[in-house]
Design a protein with these regions (language model features):
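Charged, low-complexity intrinsically disordered terminal segments
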Residues: 1-452
Length: 452
């Protein structure tokens, strides 16, 4: 029992679970980005802004680049000819940048899932290494355990067998073409925690997003934010912390110039995201509103806070993924349909993203007060794993007057998704009232025995 408690409550390394100061920026120094996929007259429409802006960021960088990316696997496009080879495109862009600028430091931080916990190599990561880009695999063992008590077993026995050194003999269900997996890798996977961040940083600007450069995710709907100013130093500090806990280092120093302006922005990670969300939800009253668009919602603190805010007559609307698709495989609707039923009974309007094989992968809140708007968005789903110092996550919080263009853009984005059937469907479309599934969700959320 003490080992389980220690694994769940272990000290967080310095630089993890960070909330920066709020920095003032001008209207043109923070920008909302979105990827939208929808059907129109039986034709799939894919309208994307995020990775085109990422490529622009890479092109304009002059001093350094730091990327922290969760999913970075190029599943064969033959699996679905509509998929975009984003992994290859980003790899080529970075390799060319290094070739043209051999003295520029480029760091690429990623999760061990992309080499399936050392069962096989990732050809795109190998290409970057050969080009002189430093690839850092995140050591998640130093963070709190997500799947208890399984992680106690893993720490006691399988962990000490080490990594499989790119050898395996079990089938891999996640990639095409198939590559064999070691049993030690499967055992490590079952800890269910990851470096889930999606950050692209240069000395000029940063992009924080919910979008992975991963072919099987390339049609998902996502959001992102481009930002400039002093916040870049906090992002770099946090990325240095991940490199350090992974046995590496990022040897970059720079000091962005202070900026002024009507908009305030803050960098928040891990459990500080939950703290920011709860603080804003708990301040809602009848004169305020909250619009949420999110891929997963299951965290009990968030759910309870939303129900209490509705009791205070706050206007709340929640747009969810129906949790029915994952890379061509059918899902069972947990946890969103169970939480949606609970929130629906509390009087909160719910709609479902109208997806067709892709996912509504957005993670964003829009708090509207009489004179201002607070926007929180990035990589973090609203789950215990994402908000409880178990995964690594990165979000931005933005406070802006209602008249500002970014306030208007995010509100119009959500309004369009909510109002039009090509984007969203009524609650009844995926209504789920199974008591058994509800308590299965509660068990999985409590123990971490799930992928959400």
């Amino acid at each position: 029992m003490p080992s389980i408690i220690f694994g769940c409550l272990r000290k967080i390394p310095e630089g993890i679970s960070l909330a920066s100061d709020f920095y003032r920026v001008e209207s043109n120094q923070v920008q909302f980005l979105r990827d939208m996929t929808f059907m129109q007259d039986s034709t799939r429409i894919v309208d994307q802004q995020i990775y085109p802006k990422v490529y622009d960021l890479i092109d304009s960088a002059e001093q350094f680049l730091v990327l922290d990316i969760f999913l970075f696997i190029e599943t064969s496009i033959d699996t679905n000819p509509e998929w975009i080879p984003t992994t290859t495109l980003l790899t080529n862009k970075l390799v060319q940048k290094k070739k043209n600028n051999p003295d520029m430091p480029i760091y690429f931080i990623t999760d061990e899932f992309n080499i399936f916990y050392y069962s096989h190599k990732n050809k795109h990561l190998e290409q970057m290494k050969e080009a002189g880009i430093e690839v850092i695999m995140t050591n998640m063992a130093k963070l709190r355990d997500s799947h208890q008590p399984y992680s106690l077993f893993w720490r006691l026995i399988p962990r000490w067998f080490g990594n499989p050194n790119y050898q395996g003999w079990l089938p891999n269900p996640f990639t095409e073409p198939k590559e064999d997996i070691a049993i030690r890798s499967y055992l490590k996977l079952l800890n269910f925690k990851a470096n889930h961040r999606k950050i692209i940083l240069s000395e000029k600007e940063a992009i924080i997003t919910s979008a992975n450069p991963h072919s099987a995710s390339s049609l998902h709907s996502n959001i992102g934010f481009r930002m400039e100013g002093e916040i870049l130093q906090d992002i770099l500090f946090s990325e240095k912390a991940i490199a350090k806990l992974s046995g590496s280092s990022i040897d970059i120093e720079f000091s962005p110039q202070p900026t002024t302006g009507p908009i305030k922005i803050q960098y928040i990670t891990e459990q500080k995201i939950q703290k920011s969300l709860l603080s804003n939800i708990e301040q809602l009253d009848a004169s305020d509103s909250l619009d949420i668009g999110v891929f997963y919602i299951s965290d009990r603190k968030i759910v309870k806070a939303l129900k209490k805010a509705r009791e205070r007559q706050a206007g709340i609307r929640i747009l969810l993924d129906a949790n029915k698709d994952a890379f061509g495989k059918e899902k069972n609707g947990i946890p969103n349909r169970q939480v949606a039923w609970e929130l629906h009974k509390a009087g909160i309007p719910i709609r479902w993203a109208n997806t067709h094989g892709e996912q509504f992968h957005t993670k964003m809140d829009i708090f509207t007060e009489p004179d201002s708007v607070v926007i929180i968005g990035g990589s973090a789903n609203f789950t215990k794993r994402n908000l409880g110092n178990k995964n690594l996550e990165a979000n931005i919080a933005i406070k802006a007057p209602r008249r500002e263009s970014i306030s208007q853009e995010v509100k119009q984005y959500f309004h369009s998704l909510w109002q039009h059937e090509k984007y969203s469907l009524p609650f009844e479309a995926y209504k789920e009232t199974s008591t058994l599934k509800y308590w299965l969700y509660r068990y999985q959320e409590f123990t971490g025995a799930s992928t959400f």
